[in-house]
């Protein structure tokens, strides 16, 4: 299917990555996060005519283009650098939902927090290196590129949920009328995420992993704020 899509003129293709096994809570939540991204940032974007987001694996890119641009890749995050280079040139990233790539991941806590910390830093590195191009992308009609830059403004989901919950709780004691909008925003975000999770992931493992989210979210925030970056 990838070859057929390439033959039809697509120079950048993202397949559907799925976790092969879910042995612990970390891998279960990682699988859920992947599928939420697949539903919103890939399948959803393509449905509305926007370019799909790259996933870091299961990606096929035209070899000649990659050969010309390989030296431009950043040490911070190759995936987002490739994505920004593609979108600057208005190269559309196609998403193949039915073409599945099965992945195995290390589920250790140290690796989990280190990886999330690295992703967050890479996101804002990409934002700061591309934000200057946002006005030109908008006014030149390069909406795929503009959309991706705006995405990098948004906090990661775990941190975003924590911020909304914190403000909602604080406002209860100061202005209960104003706090309604925060709880409504939290409900809308959770509802959107729930819709994006496929049925095959909702099982006993999922229910068990949901109970571990508060502890993991707190650890993620602490690690991001105080964790030392490995050289």
How does the language model describe each region?
Residues 130-142, 171-175:
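Hydrophobic, membrane-facing alpha-helical anchors
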Residues 104-121, 205-208:
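Nucleotide-sugar-dependent glycosyltransferase catalytic core
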Residues 138-158:
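Loop-to-transmembrane boundary segments
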Residues 75-82:
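Acidic donor-binding loop at a coil-to-helix junction in glycosyltransferase catalytic cores
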Residues 151-230:
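Membrane-embedded multi-pass helical conduit in multi-pass membrane proteins
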Residues 33-40, 113-134, 163, 216-227:
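Catalytic core of nucleotide-sugar-dependent glycosyltransferases
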Residues 83-102:
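Catalytic donor-sugar/metal-binding loop of nucleotide-sugar-dependent glycosyltransferases
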Residues 3-75, 124:
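Long helical/loop segments within the catalytic core of UDP-sugar-dependent glycosyltransferases
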């Amino acid at each position: 299917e990838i070859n057929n899509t390439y033959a039809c003129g697509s120079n950048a293709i993202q397949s559907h990555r799925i976790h092969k096994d879910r042995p612990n809570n970390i891998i279960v939540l990682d699988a859920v996060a992947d599928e939420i991204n697949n539903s919103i940032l890939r399948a959803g974007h393509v449905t509305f005519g926007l370019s799909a987001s790259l996933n870091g694996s299961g990606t096929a890119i035209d070899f000649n283009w990659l050969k010309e641009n390989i030296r431009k890749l950043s040490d911070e995050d190759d995936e987002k650098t490739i994505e920004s280079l593609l979108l600057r040139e208005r190269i559309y990233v196609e998403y193949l939902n039915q073409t599945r790539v099965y992945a195995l991941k290390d589920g250790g806590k140290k690796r989990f927090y280190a990886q999330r910390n690295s992703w967050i830093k890479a996101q804002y590195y990409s934002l700061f290196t591309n934000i200057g191009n946002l006005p030109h992308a908008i006014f030149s009609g390069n909406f795929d590129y503009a959309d991706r830059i705006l995405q990098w403004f948004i906090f990661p989901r775990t941190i975003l949920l924590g911020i909304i919950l914190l403000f909602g709780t604080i406002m209860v004691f100061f202005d209960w009328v104003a706090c309604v909008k925060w709880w409504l925003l939290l409900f809308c975000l959770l509802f959107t995420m729930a819709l994006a999770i496929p049925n095959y992931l909702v099982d006993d493992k999922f229910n068990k992993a949901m109970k571990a989210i508060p502890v993991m979210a707190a650890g993620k925030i602490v690690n991001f704020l105080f964790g030392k970056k490995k050289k």
